[in-house]
């Protein structure tokens, strides 16, 4: 709903660019969440079809301090310690056809939830970004590609519902700071993932594709992933769920040393 969005940008193909090139300098911020200044899951920004953000920060600081190094008088203390649903990015209500979100060299910051869960946009590319979150945060729409991003994970179910058709992490680095449960469980239901050239660091001890009831009719793509410098096997008790592409198959994801973003986002019907 509109009253749960701080900044609404309904127009198609709008680009927001931070003028300094330093993503820490330009901050779009809110500090409201569920039962914390809002009656519902509050969102910092709502955007439309073809939205592009570059060289800036989008954050919901309901449960995390805003530290603004360029001018410390603009620092802002979190609204509350208790973590509640406080999202950073959502779609604008009422737009039925939505595609092509692109975040480049951005910080996307919150705790519980980051992107709102929806069947739109059809495709999102998140490149060279830093993301911080707890649960139910990463991925939205049909296809989400994270390329060369860094993540700070503060809880162990970061993807929640995840994207419907594919959620790919390519050349990404994850740092974990978890509570008692040191196993990352990516998703609450069966969704397709790809992890290629990813590095996990911190206190996590292992990773599972989902919480329970593993499906036999889906395969996850994995290649060259590490945990604290050692090879990482996801869901080791269910090895048949993970497939490592051979040289020819890998061209769908990585070609001539570069990630094949064009192929991954060039979906039929889009």
Protein language model annotation of sequence segments:
Residues 1-270:
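Sequence-level preference for short, compositionally simple segments enriched
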């Amino acid at each position: 709903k509109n009253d749960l969005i701080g900044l609404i940008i309904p127009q198609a193909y709008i680009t927001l660019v931070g003028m300094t090139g330093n993503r820490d300098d330009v901050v779009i911020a809110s500090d409201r969440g569920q039962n914390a200044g809002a009656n519902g899951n509050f969102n910092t920004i709502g955007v439309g079809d073809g939205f592009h953000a570059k060289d800036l920060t989008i954050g919901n600081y309901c449960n995390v301090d805003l530290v603004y190094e360029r001018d410390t008088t603009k620092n802002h203390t979190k609204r509350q310690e208790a973590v509640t649903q406080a999202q950073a990015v959502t779609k604008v209500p009422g737009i039925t056809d939505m595609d092509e979100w692109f975040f480049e060299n951005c910080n996307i910051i919150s705790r519980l939830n980051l992107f709102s869960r929806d069947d739109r946009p059809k495709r999102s590319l998140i490149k060279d970004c830093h993301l911080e979150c707890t649960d139910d945060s990463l991925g939205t729409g049909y296809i989400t590609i994270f390329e060369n991003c860094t993540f700070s994970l503060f809880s162990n179910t970061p993807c929640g519902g995840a994207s419907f058709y594919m959620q790919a992490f390519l050349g990404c680095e994850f740092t974990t700071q978890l509570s008692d449960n040191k196993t990352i469980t990516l998703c609450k239901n069966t969704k397709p993932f790809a992890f290629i050239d990813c590095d996990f660091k911190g206190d996590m001890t292992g990773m599972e594709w989902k919480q329970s009831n593993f499906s036999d009719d889906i395969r996850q793509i994995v290649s060259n992933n590490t945990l604290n410098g050692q090879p990482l096997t996801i869901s080791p008790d269910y090895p048949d769920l993970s497939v490592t592409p051979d040289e020819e198959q890998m061209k769908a994801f990585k070609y001539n040393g570069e990630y094949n973003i064009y192929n991954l986002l060039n979906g039929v019907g889009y």
